[in-house]
Design a protein with these regions (language model features):
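Terminal leader/tail segments of proteins
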Residues: 1-24, 28-92
């Protein structure tokens, strides 16, 4: 069964990177940091929830289509590192 399409809420943008909170419906799924290099794009995806391999691939494909390709359609590769963790707090 396919996972509901994710929603991405940008929390930060610089000249070469962006940070998005990832939601599935009203539930927070995690966060993704996207860094735009000259020829490739690197993503660090930190999940708050368990996803199946198929759901994870679906999410990565959606990240690529909605965030990466719209920013740089000519890039050669989107490289993603995935972590599973929990947010302990936000400090300033």
């Amino acid at each position: 069964m396919a996972m509901e399409a994710a929603r991405f809420e940008r929390t930060l943008r610089t000249e070469s990177s962006e940070i998005f909170t990832v939601y599935g419906g009203a539930r927070r799924l995690g966060r993704v940091d996207v860094h735009y290099g000259r020829f490739e794009v690197h993503g660090t995806l930190i999940l708050d929830v368990e996803l199946t391999d198929d759901e994870l691939q679906q999410l990565i494909d959606q990240l690529d289509e909605e965030l990466v390709q719209t920013h740089d359609p000519e890039r050669e590769d989107f490289l993603v590192t995935v972590f599973k963790g929990e947010e302990l707090g936000f400090y300033s």
